[in-house]
């Protein structure tokens, strides 16, 4: 066993719990669901910057790219069909996340992961064999269904398996796997772009099957969470599983009783989608909408989706564009590791606020550097030393995101919902995230063409707004068991007005005295 820890909640209860090897390895396997999301984020920008890919599927963009030295650098990739290739995945993920909520609740978290991995695997095969744009788009839609299922189930699974004190660290494993997937994709793009025969893009797209196979096979060996087992009518199995994941020498009776109470209460809710609109859940609903909305308006996916395209737009050569994307991918991974080891010590709020401030400064600097060299005309070139400074500040921006809004944008929504609305809440979180990921992916190249360097100021302004929002409206949630989170909202200066005294409860003694309205 790994080192044990008593979970001090700060909210009135202490659940004893250890980080057992069993929990560690199950969380690692589950977190690999992030690989498929990360691989896709990293692969699309590199592939769309490859000339053989553009010649075959997007010849108009290829012609504009060849003439870019004499024309506006900002606009050479502006093409709605090219943007649809990237963005269609996220629209599919948005829709599928609602179906995933039902699968996650009725069949369990692991089968939702399995469905996501299998669908992604089929989509990867179709994309690798694509002969026309229609095949590409259909493949992307299947990839999106896989991402929707994985993103809906993995964060919930990790939050339910982890001891409260270590929930942040283990949950951020999902974001770490996303960053590893991005980095792997960028390295693969760098290698496949050198294939002289021109079919390197097929290798890049087809290798998405590797992370898909990992989560598909891995999910078959995952146990169900105690929360899911209780909710699906297997209380004895749930108690055995809770004892196994907390440690055989740990008294889990109090935590088990509270999980049973939460499940009994959740079963009184016949319409969770309607129930989540109730006044007492206003705080959770607001966070489930605002946090993923703000996460996308940090502008991070401008860098992650289109890094090679962006660097090529700034005048980098093809090799340099792909290598600069690899550098940002490395920064992304290492900064996420920083978050893993600090989130349960420093807390969620401090990381959100520090990361926000860092991103604002870097975006303003990058926008200014681009403005000085390209102005509004988009005509110019960028010296090597100047380019290095641009890459440096982009890397600092990526680091700020990677230890704040990147992991916390998934962690915080996954840990704030009570069981009775958890699948519905996580589906809202994923669908909002995918909706605005779709919007950014579909609109970015057009926005870059029209807003030019001002696009970076646009995103910086949004980061200021979201940082103020966090400072005012998000309470600290570290070390608090999920079933006790209501105490955190009740003590907050703003959200307490939405929560009546009869809504504040912790533990098994509550259910018999409180009947939820459907």
Swiss-Prot record:
Tissues/organs with expression: Highly expressed in roots. Expressed in xylem and sclerenchyma cells of roots. Expressed at low levels in leaves.
Keyword Nucleotide-binding tagged: no
UniProt topological domain (Extracellular) ranges: 40-80, 139-140, 189-202, 312-322, 373-387, 449-452
GO-annotated molecular function: monosaccharide transmembrane transporter activity; symporter activity
GO cellular component annotations of the record: membrane
Pfam family membership, one: Sugar_tr
Transmembrane segment boundaries: 19-39, 81-101, 118-138, 141-161, 168-188, 203-223, 291-311, 323-343, 352-372, 388-408, 428-448, 453-473
Membrane topology: Multi-pass membrane protein
Keyword Phosphoprotein among record annotations: no
UniProt KW keywords: Membrane, Sugar transport, Symport, Transmembrane, Transmembrane helix, Transport
Cytoplasmic side, ranges: 1-18, 102-117, 162-167, 224-290, 344-351, 409-427, 474-518
Localization: Membrane
Family annotation (InterPro entries): MFS_dom, MFS_STP/MST-like_plant, MFS_sugar_transport-like, MFS_trans_sf, STP/PLT_plant, Sugar/inositol_transpt, Sugar_transporter_CS
Protein family (similarity comment): Belongs to the major facilitator superfamily. Sugar transporter (TC 2.A.1.1) family.
Function recorded in the entry: Mediates active uptake of hexoses by sugar:proton symport. Can transport glucose, xylose and 3-O-methylglucose. May be involved in the accumulation of monosaccharides required for cell wall synthesis during root development.
Protein name (Swiss-Prot/TrEMBL): Sugar transport protein MST3
Annotated source species: Oryza sativa subsp. japonica (Rice)
